[in-house]
Amino acid sequence: MFMGASTKEGREIATKSREIVRSLIGDKIKHLKPEEREIVERIVHSTADPEYAELTRISADFVEESSKAIKEKMDILTDINMVRVGINRYEGEVKCYINHPLTYELSKEQEITRAAAAMEVAL
């Protein structure tokens, strides 16, 4: 199942979407490991911005360490609710502080985005 597609029509749409993404970025990510290509493909698909194929950097141990963290059900921290809601089958806790009262206060005080303030509040 790709991107939550569970019906035949949904799978066909998802397959076509994946083909379009691969046609746009395939050459730019061919040097990556298969797991890393999958990550970048999903980023490009969800943002609808092929430029992320060139902007995304994946550290050498990212796939291994993130897989370990997921297996251990460690908390996931995100700066926006759309991502929090999209992580809907995770057994650990997914946290987002974008609407926390301190986030609003901090963003005004420091004249920073709420997303940046949310990360400060979380830490």
Where are these regions (language model features)?
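Conserved mixed alpha/beta catalytic, RNA-binding, or beta-rich assembly cores of soluble enzyme
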Residues: 77-123
